[in-house]
Amino acid sequence: MNPVPEAAAIRVRRSGPLEGTVRVSGAKNSALKLMAAALLAPGRSVLHNVPRIADVTWMGELLERMGCKVAHEGGTATIDVPDDVVPEAPYELVERMRASIVVLGPLLGRLGEARVSVPGGDDFGHRPIDMHLKGLEELGAEFTTSHGYIEARADNLTGARVLLEFPSVGATENLLMASVLAKGTTVIDNAAREPEIADLATFLNRMGAVVSGAGTSTISIDGVERLAPVEHTVVADRIEAATYLAAVGIAGGEITIEGARADHMDMLLAKLGEMGMRVSPTADGLWAMSPGRLGPVDVSTLPYPGVATDYQPFVVAMLSVADGVGIVTENIFGGRFRTIDELLRMGADIRAEGHHVVIRGVEALSGAPVRAPDIRAGAALVVAGLAAEGETLVGDAHHVARGYEDLVGRLASLGADIDHA
């Protein structure tokens, strides 16, 4: 696959009001898992609406290392899976992104073996993969760890009832992909309910799997003997849509976000409404208007359908210039308040207390050199720069390229004063 060009920094100046129309890409958090799921069936699977981002390129490289042929052009990814897949995910590829752990499920399901490096990617504190391994053990898999690798074997995966101690998205995905070729019925209780889980289940069912209940807390999978490659369109990226909502919320204006799904963002849209934004669905997306300086709100991150932890950096950025005091509570990843130190450099008034932050909005931020610590925090700093006097230079912009296809160009099309440094 061709690499995605990366910029060292993104330069932002105070902007607004924003206006115009922007289209969201397919969801990163779905596309990566669908690419992994293609391993379940030899032959050619075709995915449409695949974003041109670094993480997709890296997943393609990982699949190529396993023997697949991967092409990505014009938003369509073609994955040719051989009969003989190499069941290993090496460190130099896996350490780039945590999502690569989801090759474990399909490799076990189809081949009965896997050797996967302990994953890397964004560091949000303690994010153990124990739930993945415990769940797969319930199906009959056995694991050892050696020299930084998880070595897995499963002579005969057998359906079982698996109760997740937390509705982990990754664990749910790995269990789904492992169990579709297992003997008997698997039931996942306390399963993750995200739209990306439902998208994966739709893809698997098109391949010939028998999955029901995806999008609810109980998913049932009846194992089948074999699957076939298919064609599928990736669901829209709700986190990218939230990024544009935060941008217009901070800068003011009126925009249309094509492709966005209001029904995938209910809780966030309710909170934005409390802040004073107006958001309503259109025939093919969302219309959003921000009348000016927004009011404060209290937000707690929760598993879907609650406010997603991926939205949290954008909410913090918006509250940093709101008219009043807001409180954000992070219940998913305790180490995810990494935007705060950079926003403080921009003049924000934020106080952290454990897994809570208290944000007293200021009238305007001050442009400053800052660093993107991860994908969403980096994008949130770009959005914050729209409300900062002077110039904001967001360094380590390669993180942003991991999750966004042309964020700079799309914000510029709405009237933002932004470019690559």
State what each model feature region is.
Residues 1-421:
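Short, structured segments at the rim of ligand-binding sites
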